[in-house]
């Protein structure tokens, strides 16, 4: 078992005036899109803001963030008529992941008798060079009901010249509280003594059979595989290699419990944007299954992340095989020494992120600047 090093507890940052935020999210990857939008909305509310979250599919919130929701945070269906809009527009409108806000909302913004809201396009997370160049750039609307208005690009990222990532103000305190009961969590999930707990949250990686074969034949690791529900569970259950491992199939859980799983495990294989950030904050060895794109544009995005991470050769090779950039047979053999090297790498990256102003603080300051 690897030690778990909690983040340092921090004090609350500067409180901004209370604003009303309208966040729009069209779901593509149900867990990642919903996860990022919910964490953003919830942390804005935690810092004194009021948020309306507009979604075309909020079904995942039933288990990811079950009610009661925090006071000041409300969830709404995708509006298609003016009657579904609030009587008073909010102060800030956020298009998450480049989604287009509804035409009725654009019309309402254009016809607003008062100053229009700050309009922000919250983009996908990336470590690629263009993020620093495009962060905070304006984009003037040239046609349609909102012609003449300006929206602003806000790019999450990994460097001080970007919008950074979501980090809750109480994250360090939560991790320190969990550290005292981490052994109990592991025991309750079938992880004994010095077992190597491996969490699996993925799509359908071609190298999954190779990973399972490794874990079966790795007595030095004493692996215990914890499999998240959905596509990861279906992929594992379809493979005969999994049977000797006796995987534990987890149930859907709220976000705080997902975080605790990452903190409890010794290796986290995660997918998408939200769980990548959570795995970095966990500070444990991690492997990212990036969302695949048909033109393989995700290959450059993955390599840019690995460059920022300063990934050692074994971690880079594992990512390449796990993401189909190289043959599944090239998947490096996991060893305790390798995991310790990966842990040091992730913790160094986490330390770098922790020195930056977090995404919520930055987007609040940006909105105040543009109002």
Can you annotate each of these PLM segments?
Residues 24-148, 230:
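Active-site and donor-binding regions of nucleotide-sugar-utilizing enzymes
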Residues 31, 38-41, 254-301:
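A donor-sugar binding/catalytic signature common to diverse glycosyltransferases
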Residues 221-251:
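Catalytic donor nucleotide-activated moiety binding site of glycosyltransferases and closely related
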Residues 311-371:
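C-terminal amphipathic helix plus adjacent low-complexity
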